[in-house]
C-alpha cells in the first residue's frame, strides 16, 4: 500500500478495520490473545522506534561533539529541569493561597512526579525547534537534545513514581 502512495499511518488504520473485535455481541477472545501477545513488543520496541524515526535525527550528520554544545545542554536542562521547576513554582503558591487544591490522596511528591513527566514534551519541542532551526547542524543537535531531555524526564519520573508507590 505504501508503494501505491498511501501513507503508512493510513495503511495501519485500514488493516485495523479488518481485525474482528465484536462478533454478534460476543467478545472475540482470539483478538484479545493477539492484543496481549503483541502489547509488550509494541510498547517497548515499535512505539519508541516510531518516535525516534519520526524525530528527524540524521545519523549521517551525528557527532558526539555536536551533542556536547551549550545549545544541546540548554535544551536538555530546559526540558528536564525547567519543566518540573516551572510546574512546581507555579502550582505550590496556588495551592498555599487556596486558589486550588491537590486532588484527594495526592501528596506533593506524587504531584512532583507528574511535574517531572511534563519534560516529555517531545512533539511540541520538536515543532518549536524545527521552526527555530530550519535545517543545518543545530537542527540535528536540537533533535538529539529533545530526545535526551525527554528520556531523562521519563526515566526520572518513573523512578519517583515507583518511590511514591513503595513508600505507602
From Swiss-Prot:
Parts of the chain that traverse the membrane = 1-21, 37-57, 70-90, 111-131, 144-164
Could you tell me where this protein is found in the cell?
Answer: Cell inner membrane
Give any Gene Ontology cellular component. Answer: plasma membrane
Q: Name one GO biological process term.
A: regulation of pH
Pfam families listed in its UniProt record: Na_H_antiport_1
Q: Does the keyword Cell inner membrane apply?
A: yes
Q: Which domain of life is it from?
A: Bacteria
Keyword list (alphabetical) reads: Cell inner membrane, Cell membrane, Membrane, Transmembrane, Transmembrane helix
- UniProt membrane topology term: Multi-pass membrane protein
Which InterPro entries does the record associate with it? Na/H_antiporter_dom_sf (IPR023171), NhaA (IPR004670)
Signal peptide positions are: none
Gene Ontology MF term list: sodium:proton antiporter activity
**Family recorded in the similarity comment:** Belongs to the NhaA Na(+)/H(+) (TC 2.A.33) antiporter family.
- What name does this protein carry? Putative Na(+)/H(+) antiporter NhaA homolog
Q: Which organism is it from?
A: Rickettsia bellii (strain OSU 85-389)
Q: What does UniProt list as this organism's lineage?
A: Bacteria, Pseudomonadati, Pseudomonadota, Alphaproteobacteria, Rickettsiales
Q: Which gene is this protein's source? A: nhaA
